[in-house]
Amino acid sequence: MVAFMSQTDTLLTELIKRADQLLEVLGKQQQGTGIEPPDWAASVAFRYRRFRNGRAALVPVSHVATMRLDDLKEIDDQKEKIQRNTAHFMAGLPANNVLLTGARGTGKSSLIKACLNTYSGDGLRLIEVDKSDLIDLPDLIDTVAGRPERFIVYCDDLSFDDGEPAYKALKSILDGTVSAAGANVLIYEIGRAHV
């Protein structure tokens, strides 16, 4: 006896096969944070990117600024404070998240880049995040949890409107809620004084 598959049976079999493939992909995404980790050896600095297709990744920065702390002039007090805080963080001692404020061109971003260059040989890494992506901060922190490196999550030009979701995500991390930053993560932000 010869069995024949109708066109409907063939289409149904193909549909089931595709549904199984989709479920497998979705299952893999659910297992992790949904953020593709980078080749950690590729750089000391990374950019968090959320792509239009919903995929997210940490993208290595090819050309990291070579700013050094000694290059920064006339900001000795700020330089000493951020260097001490970063040194404590690197030593596993208590350290604070940082909000730098001030006029444009006063060295705020340069301080953070110089700290990265000072401590990258000891395992410090920087992850730059756009303000609009701060809503993904808990997933980002989960991605680096358990890594031997120490991470500064950095956001430039931080300002929020009332009730903005990114503000709520950042505030929950800073306030130490259930999704608190791990021992290997500090947040260094640049923004307005009232944030």
Indicate residue ranges for each PLM-predicted region.
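Short loop/turn elements that form and flank the Walker-type P-loop nucleotide-binding site
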Residues: 93-95, 122-123, 146-149, 181-184
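Phosphate-binding P-loop
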Residues: 61-63, 87-95
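Walker A/P-loop nucleotide-binding motif
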Residues: 92-114
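Interdomain "pre-motor" coupling segment immediately N-terminal to P-loop NTPase/helicase cores
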Residues: 4-60
